[in-house]
């Protein structure tokens, strides 16, 4: 075989391989879309129920007054541990 024949054969194999890969990818895309539609049809997402009471975005000031001694005690405990290490 001459170089020209080998080159032509290589081009033919390359085009055939690229065509096969393109065909396979197109089939794969359609299969995934069909499976996605089937899953969404037979297993729909459950609807989210809203919470009974909205969660307040800000802690009421009365709660901060109750937490202040706890925070002070935690800071003091942490500082004592840091000094002992």
UniProtKB/Swiss-Prot annotation:
KW Translocase (keyword) present: yes
Enzyme Commission number(s): 7.2.4.2
Record bears the keyword RNA-binding: no
Compartments (UniProt record): Cell membrane
Transmembrane segments: 15-35
GO biological process: sodium ion export across plasma membrane
Top-level EC class: translocase
Topology class, membrane: Single-pass membrane protein
MF terms (GO), sorted A to Z: decarboxylation-driven active transmembrane transporter activity; oxaloacetate decarboxylase activity; sodium ion transmembrane transporter activity
First-listed, main subcellular location of the protein, grouped into a coarse class: membrane
Catalytic activity reported: oxaloacetate + 2 Na(+)(in) + H(+) = pyruvate + 2 Na(+)(out) + CO2
Database matches in Pfam families: OAD_gamma
NCBIfam families reported for this sequence: oadG_fam, PRK02919.1
Function summary: Catalyzes the decarboxylation of oxaloacetate coupled to Na(+) translocation.
Subunit comment: Heterotrimer of an alpha, a beta and a gamma subunit.
Family per similarity comment: Belongs to the OadG family.
Protein name: Oxaloacetate decarboxylase gamma chain
